[in-house]
């Protein structure tokens, strides 16, 4: 039986009924009714928000043609990158133009060099990458896939293209690229740590100028960094770093840098493979191929590109001396005191006779810097310079900048410290004072000091030609000949100027030996080394060239043992010692007595 029970409900208050009715009316109201006439549509931004302004027309730019087209508009700089340069390797060489007082580096010295290239990204941006050039493989080999998977080149910058570029090129704004602290165009993290530098001050860093030429573009910038003064009592790198007066007084350090971006050859120069029996600096990479059973390390020497004119090639093969299309030219820094310039020039020109053994005439020379040429800059990577450095360091050094793909030397900036004169003065006074009265003065006359400068100039130029120290060359001089006037003046006391043999300290007053028997000179080993590095061959591959030189080296060393090379790192070999003289290093002291 179903029982129905009526439940008596309590009436709802009128207020709650009205609220429910209003809520339902709003919820089901048509959109046209919900929009106030003349008011904003639902979801629209309030009137207080700023409306999008029409895009400003792009400025008309006056472009200077060169490697990169260069234009400036107000504070912004632009590059026009031709499509033909995408993927082309470019060497970016950054140097100090001006440094801060108290630093261990000076204006004119190199900060870094990097091989860079431009590339289009999938999003349309222009990428700037660095190519470390450390691993190679042949296109088409299966292992090439593995090599590519292990050699992604780093992206330094991603730049959005401007809309105003001419057909066939991409225009990008490069202001922030060079005003910022991007490592290829600034200091490395290690350099900043060594000088206790902090972050870049953007308001005190700017582009000074950008100049462009057919094969290179030059960017000069001023960069200001905060300075973290080292605390002597605190351990760690900051306490060991350089204390810079400008930093301690101002809290910041300002530097002027120049980056020279020079286009590398589309086809690299054919390398000459390194051979440890001849003392050259070398570069290289790791090579992978399908046919290998062991990974190869390819090493090649660093050397300048010397090429004969087509009409001279056969003459050179017949043994005639010919002039190269592009000789090696060094310029003398105009900061060099005038009295020393002729001796620095002579030290460079002395290498001409060594190049003659390789088949070249007038292959190398030095000139004074043409100060009236506005298109030349000493920071420009097209020019090699002996830079005169205002430094108390008693030294000089000879580096080079080369194409990392082939070893082709592109330029060199020899660092010539002003105080190197104290070093050669003391060497000469101690070693030769017994036989040369001129050596007994505290201040040498210009002729003697000039001769000593000439010797150091030749030694440092040798490094910039690719040559390493040969500590073993003096070990082939018969010790008894060091006091033989006729012999030592004809042959010299060491067969290489790249040795650390300095001067003939065995000679005695009664021997009557002149400066030809006291000074080092460019000698038989140096000529042989230049022949090995710079004599052209017709071989199509580096391997064929290497096999030829292997035979030449064997034959030459058998015939002339004094051409043996004993480089740095051979200190355990008694023949390759520093500051020694003659075949038996222990005997010269007895011979001189």
Place the predicted regions along the sequence by residue.
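Bacterial N-terminal signal peptides
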Residues: 21-28
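Bacterial N-terminal signal peptides that target proteins for export
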Residues: 7-20
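Conserved catalytic/binding loops enriched for acidic/polar residues
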Residues: 474-593
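Sec-exported extracytoplasmic/periplasmic mature domains
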Residues: 349-360, 462-463, 467, 503
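Auxiliary tRNA-acceptor-end handling modules of aminoacyl-tRNA synthetases
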Residues: 36-336, 354, 358, 363, ...
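The catalytic-center signature of Zn2+-dependent metalloproteases
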Residues: 43-45, 368-389, 451-458, 462-508
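Extended catalytic-interface subdomain
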Residues: 397, 402, 408-416, 457-465, ...
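Sec/Tat signal peptide C-region and signal peptidase I cleavage site
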Residues: 28-34
């Amino acid at each position: 039986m179903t029982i129905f029970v009526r439940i008596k409900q309590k009436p709802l208050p009128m207020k709650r009924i009205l609220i429910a009715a209003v809520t339902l009316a709003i919820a089901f109201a048509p959109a046209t009714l919900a929009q106030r006439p003349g008011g904003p549509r639902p979801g629209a931004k309030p009137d207080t928000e700023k409306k999008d302004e029409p895009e400003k027309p792009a400025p008309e730019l006056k472009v200077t043609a060169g490697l990169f087209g260069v234009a400036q508009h107000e504070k912004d700089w632009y590059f026009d990158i031709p499509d033909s340069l995408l993927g082309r390797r470019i060497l970016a060489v950054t140097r100090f133009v001006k440094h801060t007082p108290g630093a261990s580096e000076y204006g004119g010295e190199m900060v870094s060099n990097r091989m860079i290239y431009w590339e289009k990204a999938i999003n349309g941006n222009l990428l700037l990458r660095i190519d470390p050039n450390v691993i190679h493989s042949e296109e088409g080999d299966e292992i090439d896939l593995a090599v590519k998977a292990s050699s992604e080149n780093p992206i330094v910058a991603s730049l959005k293209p401007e809309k105003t570029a001419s057909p066939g090129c991409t225009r990008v704004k490069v202001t922030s690229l060079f005003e910022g602290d991007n490592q290829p165009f600034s200091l490395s993290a290690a350099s900043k740590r060594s000088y206790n530098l902090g972050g870049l001050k953007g308001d005190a860093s700017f582009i000074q100028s950008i100049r462009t030429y057919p094969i290179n573009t030059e960017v000069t910038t001023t960069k200001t960094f905060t300075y973290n003064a080292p605390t002597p009592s605190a351990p760690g790198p900051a306490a060991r770093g350089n204390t810079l007066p400008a930093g301690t007084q101002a809290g910041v350090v300002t530097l002027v840098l120049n980056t020279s971006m020079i286009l590398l050859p589309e086809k690299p120069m054919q390398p000459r493979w390194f051979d440890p029996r001849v003392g050259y600096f070398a570069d290289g990479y790791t090579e992978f191929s399908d046919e290998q059973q062991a990974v190869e390390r390819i090493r090649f020497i660093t050397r300048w590109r010397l090429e004969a004119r087509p009409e001279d090639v056969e003459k050179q093969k017949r043994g005639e001396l010919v002039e190269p299309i592009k000789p090696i030219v060094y310029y003398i820094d105009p900061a060099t005191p005038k009295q020393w310039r002729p001796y620095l020039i002579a030290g460079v020109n002395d290498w001409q006779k060594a190049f003659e053994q390789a088949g070249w005439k007038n292959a190398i020379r030095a000139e004074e810097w043409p100060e009236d040429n506005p298109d030349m800059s000493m920071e420009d990577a097209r020019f090699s310079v002996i830079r005169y450095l205002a430094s108390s360091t008693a030294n000089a050094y000879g580096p080079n900048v080369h194409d990392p793909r082939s070893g082709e030397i592109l330029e060199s900036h020899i660092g010539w410290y002003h105080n190197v004169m104290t070093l050669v003065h003391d060497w000469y006074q101690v070693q030769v004072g017994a036989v040369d009265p001129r050596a007994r003065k505290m201040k040498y006359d210009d002729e003697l000091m000039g001769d000593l400068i000439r010797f150091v100039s030749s030694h440092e130029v040798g490094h910039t030609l690719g040559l390493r120290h040969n500590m073993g060359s003096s070990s082939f001089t018969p010790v008894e000949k060091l006091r033989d006037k006729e012999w030592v003046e004809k042959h010299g006391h060491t067969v290489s100027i790249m040795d650390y043999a300095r001067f003939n300290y065995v000679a005695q007053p009664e021997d009557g030996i002149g400066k030809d028997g006291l000074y080092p000179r460019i000698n038989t080993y140096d000529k042989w080394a230049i022949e090995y590095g710079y004599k052209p061959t017709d071989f199509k591959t580096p391997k064929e060239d290497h096999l030829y030189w292997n035979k030449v080296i064997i034959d030459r060393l058998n015939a002339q043992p004094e051409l043996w090379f004993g480089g740095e790192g051979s200190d355990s070999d008694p023949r390759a010692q520093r500051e020694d003289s003659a075949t038996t290093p222990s005997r010269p002291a007895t011979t001189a007595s």
